[in-house]
Amino acid sequence: MSTKTNSTKATSEKTDSLKTNRGTKSSAGYSDQNIPLGGCILADTPITFNENKPVTKVKVRNTGDRPIQVGSHFHFFEANRALEFDRAAAYGKRLNISSTTAIRFEPGDETEVPLIPFGGKQTLYGFNNLVDGWTGEGVVPNSERPDKLEAIRRAAERGFKSSK
């Protein structure tokens, strides 16, 4: 019986040794608390994302006969050709929604969506290959030429609908 008690005591000590004591208040604002390894420390205030980015609102209508989903980091300018919206206003922008989420557009539905500029180098390749280059504004980096008008022409030529 005493072996079992010692075993339990040893297990308890082992568990306690896995806990990390944060000690006094740290730069992250944590006070004295025992947090197990891999434990989560939640902030007192909600996390906000994209709070200082300019938002462009665009009215979108699905003219197709099937639902269309557009993901959070898809270049909205190059979204499905059956979506009708001001594509020029969406150039270089993505949906202002949480990462890994999407917005679904049902056939015939019209809705307004918030868009924000891409961060980083603002160089976009792939999607529907309408742009394949820099989409930012201002000084052109690394000799990349922004060709917004060419991308708009390509979109119209390939049957991408636009409200303007």
Curated annotation (Swiss-Prot):
- Location (main, coarse): cytoplasm
Q: Name one GO biological process term.
A: urea catabolic process
At the top of the EC hierarchy, this enzyme's class is: hydrolase
Q: Does the keyword NAD apply?
A: no
Keywords from UniProt, A to Z, are: Cytoplasm, Hydrolase, Virulence
Q: What subcellular compartments does it reside in?
A: Cytoplasm
Q: Which GO terms describe its cellular component?
A: urease complex
- Disulfide partners: none
InterPro entries xrefs: Urease_beta-like (IPR002019), Urease_betasu_sf (IPR036461), Urease_subunit (IPR050069)
Q: Which Pfam families does this chain map to?
A: Urease_beta
* Region of interest: Disordered: 1-30
Q: Which domain of life is it from?
A: Bacteria
* Role summary: Expression of the urease operon increases the likelihood of bacterial survival by contributing to acid resistance in vitro and in vivo in BALB/c mice. Y.enterocolitica enters the body via an oral path and must survive the acidic stomach before being able to colonize the intestinal mucosa.
Subunit relationships:
Heterotrimer of UreA (gamma), UreB (beta) and UreC (alpha) subunits. Three heterotrimers associate to form the active enzyme.
Q: What is this protein called?
A: Urease subunit beta
| Species name | Yersinia enterocolitica
